[in-house]
Amino acid sequence: MALPGSLNRYLLLMAQEHLEFRLPEIKSLLSVIGGQFTNSQETYGKSPFWILNIPSEDIARNLMKRTVCAKSLFELWGHGKSPEELYSSLKSYPVEKMVPFLHSDSTYKIKIHTFNKTLTQEEKVKRIDALEFLPFEGKVNLKKPQHVFSILEDYGLDPNCIPENPHNIYFGRWIADGQRELIESYSVKKRHFIGNTSMDAGLSFIMANHAKVKENDLVFDPFVGTGGLLIASAHFGAYVCGTDIDYNTVHGLGKASRKNQKWRGPDENIRANLRQYGLEKFYLDVLVSDASKPSWRKGTYFDAIITDPPYGIRESTRRTGSQKEILKGIEKCPESHVPVSLTYHLSDMFLDLINFAAETLVLGGRLVYWLPVYTPEYTEKMVPWHPCLRLVSNCEQKLSSHTARRLITMEKVKEFENPDEYSRLLSDHFLPYQGHNSFREKYFSGVTKRIATEEQCSHEGKL
């Protein structure tokens, strides 16, 4: 199975988590760094091995400086479904492309990576020795080699049915590792200021990558909470700001979410979190504000809006308002006045969110947000839509047997011009999602049913 020598073909070794999020991340990042996604496989599916065509090694390295979904990247020299096919593929790879990394003044080592199977040391040595036909002239250096080469073997996805021989074998030159270490270094467990629903660090970086966040961008979170999403964007050099209706959260007051701590400390706030990671210079501000009544002037100024709206489960969905028929004008309220809040229906929340994004995003800017769904009733028609926004990706993360949340990425493709017309279109389109206004009740009804079933099974087991 020879590979065409004219193509810059690379092998991505992907992490086996958040599977649906991987392809949109890679596509988004390639478009940011000047590459275009062109695949060499019909489908990627759940496989950790992806073959891509990337224009240059510089673009490939820049991709790995951003991705948290990929573990490693290799310049692919050959691959096949058997050792014989691999060797034939390697022999057809242009020698002039190998020589710069195999000459006598170089040092190297060869590593073995297997997916879904463990090899003995003897089996590993046998595989390395079989590559003696390659023109290696340099010296082996296992500690600090100039070049690292890898044999990668794919034994499929089923741990209960591991084949004797691999489905695919790859050989390539290691280029770079991804940014998986960010998940640990930015872990919520180590963060100074956290809340009940602080976003997982890995997902925060995935959202920033889906949003194509880059240096000097202006990124906004209208449901900022404890600011976890701002941290990921600031890490990539974007200036960040946000709003939230909860005064205590914005100002770092009230009860703490951390175990064995009753009240928040004097310096527990979003700014302190960015300071913790050396990112304070990217912090603009966070404001107490109601997302249903944006206080921003008209215009397009956000490069990305990244947010995780409340679902009504661990954080309430609220907006300012009153049940009274006659409302007091805001100019008559004292500065210390705290407005009455009402329930903020999910369908209204997402209607306001995408309308706000369509109005304030720059052309080409992206909106990335989580949409909670009750899976037995979910259809793609429920995903919010706007004439000015194009749906880029829709990825599912399961929350329970009956609920999930979907990471929605949209890109602004048209200027916001006719708000009245948009309002009418959006109201009609949001009818399918209005049933999810009772998402909280459906979520807990499923939990109640599960507990009842478990108790019944336990009772029957004792009889």
From Swiss-Prot:
* Top-level taxon: Eukaryota
UniProt subcellular location: Cytoplasm
Which InterPro entries did the record assign? DNA_methylase_N6_adenine_CS, RlmKL-like_Mtase, SAM-dependent_MTases_sf, tRNA_mtfrase_TRM11
> Which Gene3D superfamilies has this protein been placed in?
Vaccinia Virus protein VP39
Question: Where is it found, in Gene Ontology cellular component terms?
Answer: cytoplasm; tRNA (m2G10) methyltransferase complex
Q: Which residues form a coiled coil?
A: none
- Annotated catalysed reactions: guanosine(10) in tRNA + S-adenosyl-L-methionine = N(2)-methylguanosine(10) in tRNA + S-adenosyl-L-homocysteine + H(+)
Alphabetized PROSITE patterns for the sequence: N6_MTASE, SAM_MT_TRM11
Pfam families (UniProt xref): UPF0020
> Is S-adenosyl-L-methionine given among the entry's keywords?
yes
Subunit structure of this chain's protein: Part of the heterodimeric TRMT11-TRM112 methyltransferase complex; this complex forms an active tRNA methyltransferase, where TRMT112 acts as an activator of the catalytic subunit TRMT11.
- Report the protein's function: Catalytic subunit of the TRMT11-TRM112 methyltransferase complex, that specifically mediates the S-adenosyl-L-methionine-dependent N(2)-methylation of guanosine nucleotide at position 10 (m2G10) in tRNAs. This is one of the major tRNA (guanine-N(2))-methyltransferases.
Query: Can you say what this protein is called?
Result: tRNA (guanine(10)-N(2))-methyltransferase TRMT11
Q: What organism is this sequence from?
A: Rattus norvegicus (Rat)
